[in-house]
Amino acid sequence: MPSQTLKIENARYVVTLDVERRIIRDGSILVEGRRIRRVGKAAELAGTPADRVIDAHHLVVTPGFVNGHMHISYAHAVRGIFPDDLGSPLGHVFRLQMAMTEEEEYYTTLLGLVELLRNGTVCFVDPGSTKHPDACLQAYEDAGIRVILGECVSDREAPFPLPRHGTEEAIARTASFLEKWDGRLEGRLRAWAMPFSPETCSADLLRGVKRVADERGTGLTLHHNSGPEARRESLVRHGLRPTEHLESIGVLGPNVLLSHALGLDEAEIECLARTGTAVAMCPVTAAKGGRGVAEHGRMPELLARGVRVALGCDSPNNSNHLDLVRTMNMAAIQYKDARRDMRQIPAERALEMATLMGAQALGLGDEQGSVAPGKRADLVLFDTRRPEWQALFNPVNNLVYNADGRSVHTVIVDGRVVVDAYRQSFVDEDRLFARVQEIGERLLVRTGVTLPGSRWPIV
């Protein structure tokens, strides 16, 4: 049976992210099966037949977004419960997460997938927070999204209820997870090694799971260096900065993605550049959490040294949204203010981090991240018939500085339309919203988690 064809016809702009970074006015795209076959001016593809044609005269097309650090699991059920003066929420996070049943995690994951797709994310890394992957597999399959999963492992005591195992058991569990999950859903699901952090994992564990990832040709991600406190602790414990410590034990490299990476200094940036290690930065989480981005953030220096940087939304209770357009905006503006230099992180670079560079950080740059023949057909179509898109002269500026995910009109993953004219068809949203509200209410009662409510009276 021949592959189905899809034509996106006469787009107002196609922002390709190809080698030349072309923006094609009045562009068309031909998709055959799961891949892009042709990209060019509408006149060049005029008359080319397709099984389905999308009239895109009012749409701006970009590559699908890549979310490099996104805890998909529990948080939708209890979103917004953490007050501004809580401090670290991690104790509550793991208490709530570990209490979730398979059914509860399935529905909260499903809601997360709805939000990701409706905001243009086609691929994300869940850094080990999914407790019941067997239960969530159907949600990933129905949604049609790309996902990178792993089992969170640690072998040291943590100041919060993190799952802990013996070193050899943790390595074996990682190997078993990769064997079971990597490559499922016709390749849309990848499995990585996911030690939680250098503070909660011994050097033997980190070396062991890195070896497993290398042997299987897959990746490794971990939370890393989330501020100057982590640097001080590492200097006391190892006599080395956190990134230098990872390099010294052989746990850096092109298949490693360090998440957050906020408290880096010049020596650590050099480690990352020298080893080809990538980072996933969560600018909204960092700003909302008061992490001192203006003082400790080093995104411009990382980019200047050629380090691959992905963007992440982190969690619905950290950034509190799963909208990479808003995340791009934060990445583009916060360093302009911090450095008092409007040239920092231009809009084009922010879009690169959410698309092509983000895919490269995940080792997927050959397959996705740009609108080019041979690439996977992962595309987002933005509706310019909205006030925030007016007037339109520079589509990248309008996207990064004007818009947000609410203008996502259509999303295509692997050649399949998964959001069609603002609507997804894999779940009844009203019923899902009601179900997740009930789950959250039950979860808070069951765990005994109580936090201050609204500062203003609810009457």
Could you say what each language-model-derived stretch is?
Residues 1-27, 32-37, 42, 352-459:
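Active-site microenvironment of metallo-dependent hydrolases
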Residues 76-107, 148-171, 228-255, 275-278, ...:
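Active-site gating loops and adjacent loop-to-helix segments of metal-dependent hydrolytic enzymes
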Residues 136-269:
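Metal-coordinating catalytic core of metallo-dependent amide/deamination hydrolases
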Residues 144-146, 214-219, 251-254, 271-280, ...:
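Glycine-enriched alpha-helix->loop->beta-strand junction motifs that scaffold or abut catalytic
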Residues 228-240, 268-274, 290-302, 317-336, ...:
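Histidine/acidic-residue-rich catalytic or RNA/ligand-binding cores of hydrolases
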